[in-house]
Design a protein with these regions (language model features):
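The feature marks the mature, well-folded catalytic cores of soluble enzymes
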Residues: 2-120
């Protein structure tokens, strides 16, 4: 906890910022993902994994704590964790994905959010 004195001489305790990024490994099922807005060109899984590794490296470079999940490996779109929850300082709002194939992803994200201390609605 860091204490700062304001210009009026009042001290405030500010908890240190915890920067957490939740990521999910690209699942083997990625090829079957929801892609209604782009064509169905084949996905190069080697390239997808390389791009994901570079993304994780960038997050670590900016000092994010990276939590890597593999709970949704059977969900083709499980890699897109940002679609399942909006996370604020102390609260996460769980999404209700529109595509039936994505609805099962939320439970895995909810469990991880509990592990890192984020209440959710």
């Amino acid at each position: 906890m860091t204490t700062h004195a304001g210009s009026a001489g009042v001290a405030a305790s500010i908890p240190p910022l915890r920067r957490v990024a939740i990521v999910h490994e690209p699942p083997a099922a990625l090829e079957r993902g929801e892609r209604s807005f782009v064509g169905r060109d084949p996905i190069d899984m080697t390239r997808a994994r390389e791009q994901h590794a570079a993304y994780v490296a960038l997050l670590r470079d900016v000092e994010c704590e990276v939590v890597t999940l593999n709970v949704n490996a059977h969900h083709a779109d499980g890699v897109f964790v940002e679609d399942t929850a909006l996370v604020f300082d102390e609260l996460a709002v769980l999404a209700s994905p529109g595509a039936p194939s994505r609805r099962g992803e939320v439970a895995g994200i909810a469990a991880e959010l509990r592990q890192i201390g984020r209440a959710h609605v």
